[in-house]
Regions:
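Interaction-mediating elements
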Residues: 29-211
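Alpha-helical interaction segments
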Residues: 17-18, 199
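Bacterial N-terminal signal peptides that target proteins for export
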Residues: 1-16
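C-terminal motif of bacterial Sec signal peptides marking the signal peptidase cleavage site
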Residues: 24-27
Length: 211
């Protein structure tokens, strides 16, 4: 069994290596090639509606799918992949520079048109879930660190629209009789939130049942 002090030394060495990597990625600034008015998208946060009951609340991970811009992936808390990409000489096309670009990631720069589109997407999605009184907005902070942008999306669901009554209308009345027999299997009921996704699933269920 190796002495405890040897194991401790190895742990310290690993921690030191991580610290050195973080310093290198910071020292070799990942924003050094950016022009005035350009910002690396450093972080995106979604502030969800805490006033909505937890069982009805649309979670941040769900909403993230409708955000058009997300930051570069990170390694050990650093912008390592952007740093690796920036090591490549943009004026040279050879295997070594191509390797750096392949290992790294092209910097994701703040695009306000995509930010605004993201807000529209968030609002549209909340509407589809029955929250027609919902709101979505955003804030961009470019003062925290030079050439870096921190975007916060704020969503408020509001009160949902709920289903009052459910009825089925078929041109062929014989189909209505068949469906009425199977109402116990319906996916939508009075009192449920008016969710377009569930309406689509109910249509699919009926089509499968009739087949």
């Amino acid at each position: 069994i190796p002495p405890r002090n040897v194991s401790l030394s190895a742990s310290i060495s690993r921690m030191a290596a991580v610290a050195v990597l973080a310093v290198l990625c910071t020292a070799c600034s990942v924003t050094r090639r950016l022009n005035d008015g350009q910002y690396l998208l450093q972080k995106v946060t979604i502030d969800t509606d805490g006033q909505t009951p937890k069982e009805e609340r649309i979670t941040a991970p769900t909403l993230e799918q409708y955000v058009r811009q997300t930051p570069n992936k990170r390694f050990l808390g650093t912008n390592f992949y952007v740093w690796a990409y920036n090591l490549a000489n943009p004026d040279k096309d050879n295997w070594w520079n191509n390797f750096k670009r392949k290992v790294g990631e092209e910097p994701v720069l703040l695009d306000m048109s995509l930010t605004e589109k993201s807000v529209q997407n968030l609002k549209t999605y909340m509407n589809s879930r029955g929250y027609y009184a919902s709101t979505a907005s955003f804030e961009v902070d470019t003062t925290r660190r030079r050439h870096r942008a921190y975007v916060t999306y704020r969503t408020r669901q509001g009160q949902p629209y709920r289903i009052d009554t459910v009825s089925y209308d078929f041109r062929d009345r014989s189909l209505k009789t068949v469906i009425d027999v199977d109402t116990a299997s319906t996916l939508i009921r009075p009192g449920d939130i008016f969710d377009i996704t569930m309406l689509d699933k109910e249509r699919e269920r009926i089509a499968a049942y009739l087949n």
